[in-house]
Amino acid sequence: MWSDPIADMLTRIRNANQVFKEQVDVPASNLKKAIADILVREGFIKGYTYIEDGKQGILRIQMKYKGTRKNRERVIHGIVRVSKPGRRIYVGKNNIPRVKNGLGIAIISTSKGVLTDKEAAEHGVGGEVIAYIW
């Protein structure tokens, strides 16, 4: 049986976003924290808190929406897992993908940590493309 914790996290965020949930709980890991940091920095989620549960911990992610409670609009329009356990996708520094012509971001795991596509281009590094978000 295969398991993909990153795909699970992205799916939980996507599902919570579809039904306008205020928050969603995800089992924690260092990679998931790095991804959540990028989502906060880029304005896709309000924030997250780490909750110690005696095991691996939980990330409680606060979702972000535009507009009033009655006329809400989603901030995250799409979220896609790119590199999967069965098929890893790597890019060099010259082939970093643009998401929705620059309106979205690509999350890339590099030797300098987990970065957005713009940050990876600035640092001049490539790596494994984790996800696209727009």
UniProtKB/Swiss-Prot annotation:
<dbReference type="GO" id="GO:0019843">
    <property type="term" value="F:rRNA binding"/>
</dbReference>
<comment type="similarity">
    <text>Belongs to the universal ribosomal protein uS8 family.</text>
</comment>
<dbReference type="InterPro" id="IPR047863">
    <property type="entry name" value="Ribosomal_uS8_CS"/>
</dbReference>
<dbReference type="GO" id="GO:0003735">
    <property type="term" value="F:structural constituent of ribosome"/>
</dbReference>
<comment type="function">
    <text>One of the primary rRNA binding proteins, it binds directly to 16S rRNA central domain where it helps coordinate assembly of the platform of the 30S subunit.</text>
</comment>
<keyword id="KW-0694">RNA-binding</keyword>
<dbReference type="GO" id="GO:0005840">
    <property type="term" value="C:ribosome"/>
</dbReference>
<dbReference type="GO" id="GO:1990904">
    <property type="term" value="C:ribonucleoprotein complex"/>
</dbReference>
<comment type="subunit">
    <text>Part of the 30S ribosomal subunit. Contacts proteins S5 and S12.</text>
</comment>
<dbReference type="InterPro" id="IPR035987">
    <property type="entry name" value="Ribosomal_uS8_sf"/>
</dbReference>
<protein>
    <recommendedName>
        <fullName>Small ribosomal subunit protein uS8</fullName>
    </recommendedName>
</protein>
<keyword id="KW-0699">rRNA-binding</keyword>
<dbReference type="InterPro" id="IPR000630">
    <property type="entry name" value="Ribosomal_uS8"/>
</dbReference>
<keyword id="KW-0689">Ribosomal protein</keyword>
<keyword id="KW-0687">Ribonucleoprotein</keyword>
<dbReference type="GO" id="GO:0006412">
    <property type="term" value="P:translation"/>
</dbReference>
<dbReference type="Pfam" id="PF00410">
    <property type="entry name" value="Ribosomal_S8"/>
</dbReference>
